[in-house]
C-alpha cells in the first residue's frame, strides 16, 4: 500500500515551490487554509507526485503558531541524526529517468550524490528545508535469503555488514 501524502513544515514556501514544482516536476494542485488547533493559522500546500491524484507531498506554511518561531524544518537535524538518516525517497521508473533527473538537478544548480547500492541505484540532493531528497530505481531482486537476513537483523547485532556500494559519485552543479 502506498501512502497518500507526506506532510512537513516549510520555512520558505517560495523556495519549496521552486524546488518541488520547477525542479522535481511535481504540480501544486491544492491548498487548505485555516486555523491551527493550538493557535495561529496555516496554509497546507499539496503537490501531485504521480499522474493521478493518488500520491502527494505536502508542506505547511505556519503563521502565528505558538512555539514555532524558530522552526527546524530538516527532519534529520530536528532528530539530531546525520542528514542521510531521515530522507525522502521517490521512485524512479528506470535508470534513464534517474539519469535525466540527475542532469536536471545539476543544471538547476544542485550538487548530486549518486550511489549504486547493488540492489538499487539512487541520486541524492537537498531540498530548501535541508532534507535529503532521493530518487531511486530498484535494479535487483530479493531472495529468500535476503528476507531471512533482514528478519535475523531485527533481533541480532551479530551479523555481517552488507557489501559496500558498487559505486559512489559526486556530480557538481553545472549552472550555465
Where are these regions (language model features)?
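Vicinal oxygen chelate
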Residues: 2-11, 48-51, 69-176
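Core segments of cupin and vicinal oxygen chelate
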Residues: 9-62
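Hydrophobic pocket/interface hotspot
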Residues: 16, 20, 88, 105
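Short Gly/Pro-enriched turn/cap motifs at secondary-structure boundaries
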Residues: 35, 79, 113-114
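Short, acidic Gly/Pro/Ser/Thr-rich loop/turn segments
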Residues: 54, 66-67, 140-142
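A broadly used, surface-exposed interaction patch
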Residues: 59, 67-70
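Histidine- and/or cysteine-centered catalytic micro-motif in compact active-site loops
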Residues: 62-64, 93
Amino acid at each position: 500500500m502506498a501512502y497518500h501524502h507526506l506532510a512537513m513544515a516549510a520555512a520558505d514556501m517560495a523556495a519549496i515551490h521552486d524546488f518541488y514544482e520547477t525542479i522535481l516536476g511535481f504540480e501544486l494542485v491544492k491548498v487548505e487554509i485555516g486555523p491551527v488547533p493550538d493557535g495561529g493559522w496555516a496554509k497546507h500546500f499539496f503537490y501531485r507526485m504521480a499522474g493521478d491524484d493518488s500520491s502527494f507531498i505536502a508542506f505547511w506554511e505556519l503563521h502565528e503558531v505558538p512555539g514555532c518561531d524558530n522552526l527546524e524544518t530538516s527532519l534529520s537535524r530536528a532528530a539530531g541524526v546525520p542528514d542521510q538518516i531521515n530522507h525522502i525517497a521517490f521512485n524512479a521508473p528506470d535508470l534513464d529517468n534517474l539519469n535525466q533527473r540527475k542532469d536536471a538537478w545539476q543544471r538547476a544548480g544542485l550538487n548530486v550524490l549518486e550511489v549504486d547500492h547493488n540492489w538499487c541505484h539512487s541520486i541524492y540532493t537537498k531540498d530548501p528545508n535541508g532534507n535529503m531528497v532521493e530518487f531511486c530505481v530498484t535494479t535487483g531482486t530479493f531472495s529468500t535469503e535476503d528476507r531471512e537476513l533482514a528478519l535475523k537483523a531485527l533481533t541480532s547485532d551479530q551479523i555481517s555488514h552488507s557489501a559496500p556500494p558498487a559505486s559512489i559519485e559526486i556530480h557538481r552543479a553545472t549552472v550555465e
